[in-house]
Amino acid sequence: MSRIGKLPIEIPKGVKISYTDSNLQVVGPKGTLSRTIMSGVTIEMTENHISVSRDDDGIKSRSAHGLTRTLINNMVTGVTKGFETALEINGVGYRAELKGDVLNLSLGYSHPINFSLPKGINVEVDKMTKILVKGVDKELVGQTAAKIRDFRGPEPYKGKGVKYADETILRKAGKTGKK
């Protein structure tokens, strides 16, 4: 058995889960998420717990067992607490500004970058150099933060660019010059 897959998922109060024809829908105070569950995995629900088991010991069933449990747990956590990822912008003249549902980034290029936010994602900009990406879907929050970071990733010499708040950049020494 998968160590992660055999752990039960606790359903908090205020969360409703419905499972029909391999479609799982989780409704909570922060929103609604739905996902198609892979074949080879069975979901059993009680009043306040969900358990995931696999149908057989095939390679696909074994690999889907722990993954399915983790995805369902992330859905439950997302609709109750939500997820957030913090980004920092470093560099002279680098800044971010939020206009409606468009994030306007000035990252040292000859043109500003206008990034349209996907549905279900909220962004907060603090002091024009800190970006907080929030949402209920963990995958979408992470993907949106990665797209914003990819516009100008941190460079190793001066550390300029967009980086995750908890990311450390390994700095390189510059040219030493002739002596």
Curated annotation (Swiss-Prot):
Question: Which Pfam families does the record match to this protein?
Answer: Ribosomal_L6
PROSITE patterns membership: RIBOSOMAL_L6_1 (PS00525)
Q: Keyword annotations for this protein?
A: Ribonucleoprotein, Ribosomal protein, RNA-binding, rRNA-binding
- The organism's superkingdom is given as Bacteria
Entry similarity comment: Belongs to the universal ribosomal protein uL6 family.
- Give the protein's function: This protein binds to the 23S rRNA, and is important in its secondary structure. It is located near the subunit interface in the base of the L7/L12 stalk, and near the tRNA binding site of the peptidyltransferase center.
Q: What is this protein called?
A: Large ribosomal subunit protein uL6
The gene coding this protein:
rplF
